[in-house]
């Protein structure tokens, strides 16, 4: 069921969590670029509040002398829809959500208002036309790109040779290997490619030093060293440590 939408003024912007910031900045710049428009009002609810605050800060840094008044609180939103197989049941639901209203104006606003903010210092403002704002570097590629997807990599160190740890490289996620020990960070005589490696499957589990230490079998469990296990406790690699005699 469609519900009647409240009329929106020409100088008003209603921000949604799915809207593109580029479009909002472009529209806001066009409003303030008009000589007849002295103010702009930005409204948002719920998850879109953060985007509305970001939009206001961008506009304030592109137009000089903008006074600001911010109001926030909670409001009740009513959703109406029909249910049932024959769409005969009329359902009304009410929910309380947070909202924010940001008024930016070239004219002086009430300085006694609790949400009043004076214009930014001109040294922090770089005036641009609407076209220059959209074509500027932060917006040419549709916003910023975070770098967390590159994972992390430990430096040299760890245990003897090239220890440390490695993240999941340049891939977002690789289910076969979550993290991998660096070289030489496990038990074993020669300290070859040791460390530990997570993940199941064949050859998974823990992998110790150079053919020694702990090594996970195909079905999990432990397999000691080269020929360890039930015959001789557990046995490390070359130069590692060796358990006692087999139990009779």
Swiss-Prot record:
Gly residues composition bias: residue spans: 222-248
- Protein role: Possesses DNA- and RNA-binding activities. During the asexual blood stages binds to a sub-population of mature mRNAs and regulates the timing of their translation. Binds to DNA with relaxed sequence specificity. Associates with the subtelomeric TARE6 repeats.
Q: Species lineage, top-down? A: Eukaryota, Sar, Alveolata, Apicomplexa, Aconoidasida
Molecular function per GO: DNA binding; RNA binding
Q: Which residues form a coiled coil?
A: none
Ranges where the record places region Disordered: 217-248
Sorted UniProt keywords: Chromosome, Cytoplasm, DNA-binding, Nucleus, RNA-binding, Telomere, Translation regulation
Where is this chain's protein located in or outside the cell?
Answer: Nucleus; Chromosome, Telomere; Cytoplasm
> What is the documented disruption phenotype for this protein?
Attempts to knock out the gene were unsuccessful, indicating that disruption is deleterious to parasite intra-erythrocytic growth.
Write down the Pfam families for this protein, in alphabetical order. Alba
Q: Which organism is it from?
A: Plasmodium falciparum (isolate 3D7)
Q: Does the keyword Nucleotide-binding apply?
A: no
Report the protein name in the record: DNA/RNA-binding protein ALBA1
Subunit structure, briefly?
A: May form homodimers. Identified in a TARE6-associated complex consisting of over 30 proteins and including ALBA1, ALBA2 and ALBA4; the complex binds to the non-coding subtelomeric repeat region TARE6.
Tell me, in one coarse class, where this protein mainly resides: nucleus
- The encoding gene is ALBA1
Per the UniProt entry, what is one GO biological process? regulation of translation
Instruction: Kindly state one GO CC term assigned in the UniProt record.
Output: nucleus
Record-stated family? Belongs to the histone-like Alba family.
